[in-house]
Curated annotation (Swiss-Prot):
This is Interleukin-8. SMART domains: SCY. Its main location: secreted. It comes from Gallus gallus. Disulfide bonds join 33-60, 35-76. It comes from the Eukaryota. Induction: By serum. Expressed constitutively in Rous sarcoma virus (RSV) infected cells. The gene is CXCL8. The lineage of its organism: Eukaryota, Metazoa, Chordata, Craniata, Vertebrata. GO terms for molecular function: chemokine activity; CXCR chemokine receptor binding; cytokine activity; growth factor activity. May be an autocrine factor that promotes the growth of fibroblasts and is involved in the neoplastic transformation of fibroblasts by v-Src. Chemotactic for peripheral blood mononuclear cells as well as for heterophils. Keywords: Chemotaxis, Cytokine, Disulfide bond, Growth factor, Secreted, Signal.
Amino acid sequence: MNGKLGAVLALLLVSAALSQGRTLVKMGNELRCQCISTHSKFIHPKSIQDVKLTPSGPHCKNVEIIATLKDGREVCLDPTAPWVQLIVKALMAKAQLNSDAPL
């Protein structure tokens, strides 16, 4: 099961690499949305190095999911895209497993 989940996550991450979503240049610690557009086309998980999830809040009304690709580009992912939702679900499950692990 973990192998399949990893493969799906990797597949999703690579698809993020091909994304057309862009992030705003981060200027200090400004309280505003970081994504000016989002990408919904699939990115293969092998192309994704990291994924950052920012919940909505006073800084931005949108949930923002920013994937850092292996080439260093940052891509804003569409949180409503089914493949992006799978990535988020996998990350949350992994975080839950890590938090349940004994010290």
